[in-house]
């Protein structure tokens, strides 16, 4: 479906790919996001090379922890256990790769009725990363050294 996109028209079936099941999204989101006749010009080049070239190249350069969430009703990404393991293997520079599934959503997680739950999971992951960093920098040896300097 995505390969059929052009700068002047969206391919048939795009709404079904990105915005289903329909009842998982507020009506105003669906009407405002899916009534456009064309996409941004950059989307054409991005989608054409994304999965085979651009995503693997970018993933290999990510040096931060990654939380990769797929939708319960995902239709863009292949999201079985083997698929997620293959995606995780692309993040070779990342110190941590975690996957999750967001229930009650289609591909556009951030715009569904479950967007708040999804974003809370993202923030929770960020907090875990911050806490882990604090734990590493506040090892017992570091704390002892700081107490000596303060005392």
Q: What is the role of each PLM region?
A:
Residues 1-80:
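Alpha/beta-hydrolase
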Residues 54-57, 94, 117:
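Generic structural microfeature
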Residues 96-151:
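Catalytic active-site module of serine/aspartate enzymes centered on a nucleophile-bearing elbow/loop
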Residues 72-105:
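Conserved loop-alpha-helix segment in the C-terminal half of the alpha/beta-hydrolase fold
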Residues 59, 91, 126-130:
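Hydrophobic, Leu/Ile/Phe/Ala-enriched alpha-helical segments that form helix-helix packing faces
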């Amino acid at each position: 479906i995505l390969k059929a996109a052009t700068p002047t028209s969206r391919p048939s079936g795009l709404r079904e790919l990105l915005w289903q099941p329909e009842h998982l999204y507020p009506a105003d989101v669906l009407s405002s996001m899916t009534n456009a006749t064309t996409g941004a010009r950059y989307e054409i080049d991005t989608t054409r090379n994304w999965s085979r070239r651009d995503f693997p190249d970018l993933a290999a350069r990510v040096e931060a922890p990654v939380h990769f969430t797929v939708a319960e009703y995902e239709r863009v990404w292949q999201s079985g256990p083997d698929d997620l393991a293959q995606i995780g293997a692309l993040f070779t520079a990342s110190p941590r790769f975690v996957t999750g599934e967001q229930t009650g959503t289609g591909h556009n997680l951030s715009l569904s009725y479950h967007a708040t739950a999804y974003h809370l999971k993202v923030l929770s992951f960020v907090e875990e990363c911050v806490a882990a960093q604090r734990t590493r920098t506040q090892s017992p040896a570091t704390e002892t050294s700081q107490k000596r300097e303060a005392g």
